[in-house]
Amino acid sequence: MIEVLLVTICLAAFPYQGSSIILESGNVNDYEVVYPRKVTALPKGAVQPKYEDAMQYEFKVNGEPVVLHLEKNKGLFSKDYSETHYSPDGREITTYPAVEDHCYYHGRIENDADSTASISACNGLKGHFKLQRETYFIEPLKLSNSEAHAVFKYENVEKEDEAPKMCGVTQNWKSYEPIKKASQLVVTAEQQKYNPFRYVELFIVVDQGMVTKNNGDLDKIKARMYELANIVNEILRYLYMHAALVGLEIWSNGDKITVKPDVDYTLNSFAEWRKTDLLTRKKHDNAQLLTAIDFNGPTIGYAYIGSMCHPKRSVAIVEDYSPINLVVAVIMAHEMGHNLGIHHDTDFCSCGDYPCIMGPTISNEPSKFFSNCSYIQCWDFIMKENPQCILNEPLGTDIVSPPVCGNELLEVGEECDCGTPENCQNECCDAATCKLKSGSQCGHGDCCEQCKFSKSGTECRASMSECDPAEHCTGQSSECPADVFHKNGQPCLDNYGYCYNGNCPIMYHQCYALFGADVYEAEDSCFKDNQKGNYYGYCRKENGKKIPCAPEDVKCGRLYCKDNSPGQNNPCKMFYSNDDEHKGMVLPGTKCADGKVCSNGHCVDVATAY
């Protein structure tokens, strides 16, 4: 039996319309005053935690009733989350705060399938929600003895600088065809089925300028970073990504690098510091520097492309140019998108009626959606580069808070969790106890069919290539066995290539991916340009210097293709972009000669390469 506790707050019958007010989000020139009413459902006799796992609020927007459903973002912090700041004398102070009972939520609006919400409930409700295809912000008015909140739109916040803002990544494409092709591709339902979530362990660094900007209030800075991470987490789920905050470092006694308006200098400096300092202290996948400095020109963010999991380049820098959390979080998600191999959108790309996250300029309304191009490029990066660091999924045993039956999270001690009895749609699961119903062997999993284990030999994960055999159910478990690849170096595609991390990389496929049909591997003579060591022809980079290929290594540098497509006659076609010099290089593991593969810009014996 569920006992419903109503926490009733006076709800204005006709919301007050305000003309202008100064809030944390800025000077708002048109807003609506609402009085949220909280409705909490707890099992009878249960002790109410400080912040429930699920909450519901009712209020009015434009005179119409709104029901906001919230669920705690339990994956916001990693189990080993840490915070570091520095004493005035420079001493490093690292703590591991208890963050299980936090106050950061994702949610939706009742009866609005297209709605989303990201809310901090620490002191009233602060955040944003999408209602009937429009984004609204909500924030406490901080009046004494009042539960009044302001609801407003982004367009009603006064902007200090109306000039267009943009990402610092510039695209100097030799051809827009790869983007055009990506916009026309469709990821099949079968591919989506076998596309597991990726998990980015995010580390945020805050520079001293941010400390000064916030008058040294470290608690205020921490709260803002939590809110930003919560929004980034919400945005990334559309890419089948989950971002967990593993650490926060505040440069409270001085910057650890020289932070300059020059984004190239600052990004490289931060990347080097991350590699030589931060990574030696804290394991993480991706780091972002938030700074109060005003970058040169209209730039507010900058990142390396296709660098996720790289020990140095898996970083981004973001200017904290707006007091509105959603606006800054969008830039953080945008720059992480670059790290995930995503380029700026073009006219060929779409995300419905909304502005897209990866647009090169910041739109008048904050974006929250990745385009079709972004999804394909991210998928392509993951499949080709196989970044290993984002594959480690947090286990159920990593959830340190007590299990809560009905929250749709499978936790320790539960056999299943399909939500509340009213919402459960799993015929195998008893929603009241989170145990399997009598006669059921399973309630979920790729090897669970009609509450029974799938027959032994049933395919549960398709083969993605000759080097990635399909996995089959064992008949003894509801889970598909772990994804296993053929051994690196095993011949594939009739000896045209060798297996590498589940793929069979050959130059023909790489030419096709860059330029399309009727394009093939070029003659050996074309690859001699890689001996020049110039801006495009080289084998690898060491300390920022481009190293020319040795004669025996020329097929492990820039990729050259022969274009036989209609209207083309280019025997030595190559791809080069200033903003992503790595794109167009021969991929690691590619066959460069009989019995040899590319490894770190060298053509080495396959027997010793792995």
UniProtKB/Swiss-Prot annotation:
Cofactors needed by this protein, per the record, are: Zn(2+)
| Domain Peptidase M12B intervals | 198-394
Quote the catalytic activity from the record: Cleavage of 5-His-|-Leu-6, 10-His-|-Leu-11, 14-Ala-|-Leu-15, 16-Tyr-|-Leu-17 and 24-Phe-|-Phe-25 in insulin B chain
Q: Which residues bind Zn(2+)?
A: H334, H338, H344
Q: Which residues bind Ca(2+) 3 per the record?
A: D468, P469, E471, D483, V484
Q: What is this protein called?
A: Zinc metalloproteinase-disintegrin-like bothropasin
Q: How is its activity regulated?
A: Inhibited by EDTA and EGTA.
Family annotation (PANTHER family): ADAM A DISINTEGRIN AND METALLOPROTEASE DOMAIN, DISINTEGRIN AND METALLOPROTEINASE DOMAIN-CONTAINING PROTEIN 28
User: Where on the chain is Pyrrolidone carboxylic acid found, per UniProt?
Assistant: Q192
Q: Where is this motif: D/ECD-tripeptide?
A: 466-468
Q: How does it assemble?
A: Monomer.
Instruction: Summarize where Ca(2+) 2 binds, as residue positions.
Output: V404, N407, L409, E411, E414, D417
Other facts noted in the record for this chain: The metalloproteinase domain which is released from the cleavage of the disintegrin bothropasin may be unstable.
> Which family, according to UniProt?
Belongs to the venom metalloproteinase (M12B) family. P-III subfamily. P-IIIb sub-subfamily.
What's its EC? Answer: 3.4.24.49
Which BP terms does GO give this entry? Answer: proteolysis
One cellular component GO annotation, for this chain's record? plasma membrane
Protein localization: Secreted
Instruction: Summarize where Ca(2+) 1 binds, as residue positions.
Output: E201, D285, C389, N392
